[in-house]
Amino acid sequence: LGGGNHFIEIQEDENGMACIMLHSGSRMFGNMIGQYFNKIAHEMNDKYFSTVPSEYNLPFLPVDTDEGQRYLNWMNLAMDFAFENREVMLEKVKHIFTEQVEKYTGITPNYSDEINCHHNYAALENHYGESVWVHRKGAAEGEVAIIPGSMGSNSYIVRGMGKAESFLTSSHGAGRNYSRTGAKEKFSVESVMVDLRQRNVVLGKTSKKDVAEECRF
């Protein structure tokens, strides 16, 4: 599953239906791919005399080079890994959920369609009549997407409206008012836990020391 803002959550929608939502990705596998090719991109930008200042940490990989094609292949593999990772975890959660519901209610739950969307990737798309690479970081293609809320706040299933200005993209999260460090400095563990209890949120997390990082404040 991973740490940080990754989670598995049982929710209730506006119609009183139970929902399972989880957030995870390619884990260290994807991170290592990104770091490896980011280093290569820095070296290539020095070679090509890139006009982008190195302190911006935005080196590029020309897609018509061997290095660029290798990155695309590895990125797609990481995306496939992330997709399957979420699928496997969701199946395990559904299995446990079904067992417990049947045990305590005698009812076998039925599951509706699933939504599984990527949120860190690049894709070749057509916008404004041009073929361009769209980089989505913490964002999702705005068809049917998921916007998870902070702990104790609402999450949303959304359908894109086809806004060209956003390159047909939706956000993939609630955003932040504070950095993780800033949130821990401003809000105590106790205050976050009191807020969650008041909102009838059960947090099944052994260590609570970092809960302020993802609180709704």
Feature-to-residue mapping (PLM):
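Domain-length cofactor-binding catalytic modules of enzymes
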Residues: L1-F217
